[in-house]
Amino acid sequence: MKVLLLGAPGAGKGTQAQFITAAFGIPQISTGDMLRAAIKAGAPLGLEAKKIIDEGGLVRDDIIIGMVKERIAQDDCKNGFLFDGFPRTLAQAEAMVEAGVDLDAVVEIDVPDSVIVDRMSGRRVHLASGRTHHVTYNPPKVEGKDDVTGEDLIQRDDDKEETVKKRLAVYHEQTEVLVDFYSKLEGEHAPKYIKVDGTQPVEAVKAEILGALGK
């Protein structure tokens, strides 16, 4: 099963990715992890990517696609794989098809922006331990204080409303193009497109996704 998982930041993609990979016995592949592994291994593409990153540049699509092809040729991908956060752009999606990397399914976890903003902007974190609270759904015993240590909880910059809204705008801009691209593919290249309501309880989202994927 070769799956591309789409979902805005805060849509619950990480949780569902774990369920999908466990159900099908496939690895989760993210370009960030792949880049770090290739750089650590001293692979030629990894070294080329490191040079670009060190100079403050964006790694070119041809390098990313090359790494993806190498990664999915490994033994643990024989039953398939789950792409997380890749392809991000139309150019990457087109290059993947041209490189012969087809998908069985594109799964989009759909959550309204207002819900995402509420989920993320309400998060509060205890930096030293990583413990998280939510002002509405999981409030601390004392407002603004960690339950265990009594130390301050903070709102990360990434979770501030303005930042979340900007990230959502970028996500929609990129994803709409991808959804359009995959829905128009025909024949053997055409993946099944599955859109799931991500505002449901976690177990309901899991059941709907796995059911649609034939599990």
UniProtKB/Swiss-Prot annotation:
Reactions this protein catalyses: AMP + ATP = 2 ADP
Region annotated LID, chain positions: 122-159
Pathway in which the depicted protein is active: Purine metabolism; AMP biosynthesis via salvage pathway; AMP from ADP: step 1/1
Binding residues annotated for AMP, in chain numbering: 31, 36, 57-59, 85-88, 92, 156, 167
EC primary class: transferase
Region (NMP): 30-59
The organism's place on the tree of life at top rank: Bacteria
EC numbers: 2.7.4.3
Keywords assigned: ATP-binding, Cytoplasm, Kinase, Nucleotide biosynthesis, Nucleotide-binding, Transferase
Gene3D superfamilies, per database record: P-loop containing nucleotide triphosphate hydrolases
Cellular component terms (Gene Ontology): cytoplasm
GO term, biological process aspect, one: AMP salvage
Gene Ontology terms for molecular function: adenylate kinase activity; ATP binding
Pfam family, one: ADK_lid
InterPro entries hit by this protein: Adenyl_kin_sub, Adenylat/UMP-CMP_kin, Adenylat_kinase_CS, Adenylate_kinase_lid-dom, P-loop_NTPase
Binding-site list for ATP: 10-15, 123, 132-133, 200
Localization in the cell: Cytoplasm
HAMAP family: Adenylate_kinase_Adk
Family named by the database record: Belongs to the adenylate kinase family.
Assembly description: Monomer.
Domain remark text: Consists of three domains, a large central CORE domain and two small peripheral domains, NMPbind and LID, which undergo movements during catalysis. The LID domain closes over the site of phosphoryl transfer upon ATP binding. Assembling and dissambling the active center during each catalytic cycle provides an effective means to prevent ATP hydrolysis.
Known role: Catalyzes the reversible transfer of the terminal phosphate group between ATP and AMP. Plays an important role in cellular energy homeostasis and in adenine nucleotide metabolism.
Name this polypeptide is given: Adenylate kinase
Organism: Neisseria mucosa
